[in-house]
Amino acid sequence: MKYKRIVFKVGTSSLTNEDGSLSRSKVKDITQQLAMLHEAGHELILVSSGAIAAGFGALGFKKRPTKIADKQASAAVGQGLLLEEYTTNLLLRQIVSAQILLTQDDFVDKRRYKNAHQALSVLLNRGAIPIINENDSVVIDEVKVGDNDTLSAQVAAMVQADLLVLLTDVDGLYTGNPNSDPRAKRLERIETINREIIDMAGGAGSSNGTGGMLTKIKAATIATESGVPVYICSSLKSDSMIEAAEETEDGSYFVAQEKGLRTQKQWLAFYAQSQGSIWVDKGAAEALSQHGKSLLLSGIVEAEGAFSYGDIVTVFDKESGKSLGKGRVQFGASALEDILRSQKAKGVLIYRDDWISITPEIQLLFTEF
């Protein structure tokens, strides 16, 4: 089979009735498809929205709440109810499911990242289907992933999935908004995510959830840079998940980078928090960006920030001002200042294994989303 390990993301609009409440029939349809794929030998992860939709009615709200506290309370109730729906339906097919609630901290903190990766690996190896959502009942903006499109991409990269499928109410990326532009055409295969692709994503998508088409392009960037291809397709067909796994569903396919980022490089690229800035000369800039070399102390022109040994810093080309990438330093700021002042700068500040170059696609990720 081409895609053994698959991460599916199902959004709010794919799980709810017209009044915004949870549709048990839609949940049942999803679990039936998961069961069929599981029985065919696939390893599956489901990133599922729907906690607020499942819980607001039980708390007496007439419609989906808008206040943060009301939404968090609804999510707290709904997480259990939603998982019960998934668990009950999957157990009918003798399939075990597991709930994992994540926040951005679980990706930023390397220890927690490792723990989450290990837990998911055990679940997959034991034949369980992890059902993942952001921990909406307690999460705050500072540690919030923000949408389940992004979360699903981060999870797919973490477990080195063979495919990420983003199910939505639009059957792929169009050249315009298919709801208002009759000339809009679906892009079936996207080799590179650039500004033109981002501009195309601006108008399409659903207003029911927090993840429109633009967030799906962000997710596709994270996943494809990590070596995971992405398929955006419609959830409206009863067998859309099965067809996506078999590549027979209509949609948009985003090609993965041939040499995707491994775990350490993913962490550096997407999650590591920079504690300072380093400016380098032309020779060092070329060595880093074009030849994959380590950053030598002799190439450093200037340093800024109160960083310590082992911290992450951002490196800039002094001549152009362009950001080159991020890396883990072998000297703290004060020690580096002494070395540079002594004019005996020999040795390495950042080893190439602790370095990630910022590609145009990753740069767009930081500046456009």
UniProtKB/Swiss-Prot annotation:
Which transformation does this protein catalyse, written as a reaction? L-glutamate + ATP = L-glutamyl 5-phosphate + ADP
Q: Where is it located? A: Cytoplasm
One Pfam family per UniProt: AA_kinase
Q: Name one GO cellular component term.
A: cytosol
**Binding positions for substrate?**
49, 136, 148
Any Gene Ontology biological process: L-proline biosynthetic process
Q: Where's the PUA domain? A: 275-355
Instruction: Give a yes or no for keyword Zinc-finger in this entry.
Output: no
Residues binding ATP: 9, 168-169, 210-216
Q: What is its EC number?
A: 2.7.2.11
The entry's family comment says: Belongs to the glutamate 5-kinase family.
Q: Explain the purpose of this protein.
A: Catalyzes the transfer of a phosphate group to glutamate to form L-glutamate 5-phosphate.
From the Swiss-Prot or TrEMBL record, give the protein name.
Glutamate 5-kinase
Which species is this record about?
A: Streptococcus pneumoniae (strain Hungary19A-6)
